[in-house]
Amino acid sequence: MAFDPLLCRPILHSLPSAFKVNLRTARSGHWLENSILHLVDEAGSGQAGSKAVLAKLSEVLFVDTLRRYIAKLPDREVGWLAGARDPIVGKSLTLLHSRAEHPWTMAELAKEVGLSRSALLERFSRYLSEPPMTYLIRLRLQLAARALTATGRGVVEIASDVGYESEAAFNRAFKREFGLPPARYRRKQRTEGNNS
């Protein structure tokens, strides 16, 4: 599972510091217990391919545990995971993440999820503590930051790819979010990456 600290930040902030899974009461406790035992055996085996097995099995266990955690969240819980579970906010998040470059408006997003603008604004903000368009701006900038560090594409192209029509507007928004203009951010990230 690819881990991008910038894009995963909202999810990570919604997680508890530890998960507790009761194997005796979990519906698939037997499967979980056997998987954990296999993980422990695999870690000590030193066999060819054991790193790949450990990575994939850990990923499956994490996703399964995360699903259980989300399913048991109280109805009044807030945060990214609780929002993702809500049918309206979850659909909004899916739309924004799958088409971040789209020139979304509150009216269009509200129409897509079947609510009025004010109802969507209230519901989205209740779960995520910010309005959908603010969330979208941050998402676009995080996607741009990832592209700046992972590719050699130009700033103008990246700005366009994440939904900015104006390079100047992109540069201002990026600097406001990350404290540096995009080109300097790229150089800094690459320099820090080379020093690690």
Regions found by a protein language model. Give the residues of each.
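Charged/polar, solvent-exposed surface patches and flexible loops
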Residues: 13, 34, 41, 82, ...
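Short, Lys/Arg-enriched, Trp-marked, Pro/Gly-tolerant hinge/linker segments that flank
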Residues: 19-27, 43-58, 62-102, 107-113, ...
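A hydrophobic/aromatic-rich effector-binding and dimerization subdomain
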Residues: 1-40, 69-72
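Short amphipathic alpha-helical/adjacent loop interface patches that line ligand
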Residues: 36, 58, 141
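Terminal helix-turn-helix DNA-binding modules in bacterial transcription factors
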Residues: 91-98, 103-110, 115-116, 122-171, ...
